[in-house]
Amino acid sequence: MSSVDILVPDLPESVADATVATWHKKPGDAVVRDEVLVEIETDKVVLEVPASADGILDAVLEDEGTTVTSRQILGRLREGNSAGKETSAKSEEKASTPAQRQQASLEEQNNDALSPAIRRLLAEHNLDASAIKGTGVGGRLTREDVEKHLAKAPAKESAPAAAAPAAQPALAARSEKRVPMTRLRKRVAERLLEAKNSTAMLTTFNEVNMKPIMDLRKQYGEAFEKRHGIRLGFMSFYVKAVVEALKRYPEVNASIDGDDVVYHNYFDVSMAVSTPRGLVTPVLRDVDTLGMADIEKKIKELAVKGRDGKLTVEDLTGGNFTITNGGVFGSLMSTPIINPPQSAILGMHAIKDRPMAVNGQVEILPMMYLALSYDHRLIDGRESVGFLVTIKELLEDPTRLLLDV
């Protein structure tokens, strides 16, 4: 049998090193070609390292938590046909009847097919994948399956607690758990602190009447979905309005590099997305060339990749301006933090019915607060306020987005 080195994938120039996150096999385990052996976590994404051939994991040279660099040897794989024999032997030990062997085989395949996000969710809650029924393709576990299982667990535990007399927990029962920060969380912490300490950040606010967009979605939403196969959401309107405002105020689409101001003549917009690993900002590129349907599809694609831990370094690199939507979590108002080296970030919030004065009359309208945080070293009040007013005007008259007026 020949021995094959298991190597760290080539890391982009912007990524200096990585951390061994999870070994899915231990020495002596049989593996098949393209089966995920180990996950490598960078500042931005989790990279899966698959087996290059059938065989047996011969050695693990870098343990979980170790910092590694590009092309470093992680372990060794011994090629051979014994993988099939060992897998068969394990299945025979687990199941004595054909039906049991078939079930064991299915469970083993489904567990191997778990996405990094699902594995991490199971590990965080100390759950056994085999104890949860999967509803995905081929019986695979989905995030919804795990969340439903978690939702049921407290209900079962709360019944006897309700019947028992209330008792104060003993002081000895108080505990703490200390866990190391993930590379992503550490990187997020570093960048947020960098933004606060290295920019002259200021936030300006405005509010927008969302009724015109809501009426437009109500009137054309069904036809839009039938035509394009995607729901007409709010984000495509936000992105379109941002691009038009960036064209009118190029300082907001610029960045500072040393003593120079770099003006970008392209429009790559970062979208703040919450994932099981933390907050990431994948990039929509050349959004000025995209239609509403294309924007909605791109946003959905990036959101799904983020949820499943499939975002690549390329997905997260670049971006000239960021949009964050705290409204999906119920946020009414916030002061978003700039995403360096960008110079501004737009915060969208929850849409709430509020009484507003319209032509001397009080009307109940669906209103949303807008927040623009910007680097005052580059962007002055005229540009920041004008930028935000432009977005307000475009959202309150969405036909202007389509007519480019």
From Swiss-Prot:
CDD domains associated with the record: lipoyl_domain
Protein name: Dihydrolipoyllysine-residue succinyltransferase component of 2-oxoglutarate dehydrogenase complex
Subunit structure: Forms a 24-polypeptide structural core with octahedral symmetry. Part of the 2-oxoglutarate dehydrogenase (OGDH) complex composed of E1 (2-oxoglutarate dehydrogenase), E2 (dihydrolipoamide succinyltransferase) and E3 (dihydrolipoamide dehydrogenase); the complex contains multiple copies of the three enzymatic components (E1, E2 and E3). Interacts with SucA (via N-terminus), the E1 component of OGDH complex.
Gene: sucB
Positions of modified residues (N6-lipoyllysine): 44
Annotated Peripheral subunit-binding (PSBD) domain residues: 113-150
Family affiliation: Belongs to the 2-oxoacid dehydrogenase family.
Record organism: Escherichia coli (strain K12)
Gene Ontology MF terms: dihydrolipoyllysine-residue succinyltransferase activity; lipoic acid binding
Pathway: Amino-acid degradation; L-lysine degradation via saccharopine pathway; glutaryl-CoA from L-lysine: step 6/6
Annotated function: E2 component of the 2-oxoglutarate dehydrogenase (OGDH) complex which catalyzes the second step in the conversion of 2-oxoglutarate to succinyl-CoA and CO(2).
EC number in record: 2.3.1.61
GO process annotations (BP): L-lysine catabolic process to acetyl-CoA via saccharopine; tricarboxylic acid cycle
Top-tier EC class: transferase
Ranges of residues in domain Lipoyl-binding: 3-78
Keywords for the protein's UniProt record, in alphabetical order: Acetylation, Acyltransferase, Lipoyl, Transferase, Tricarboxylic acid cycle
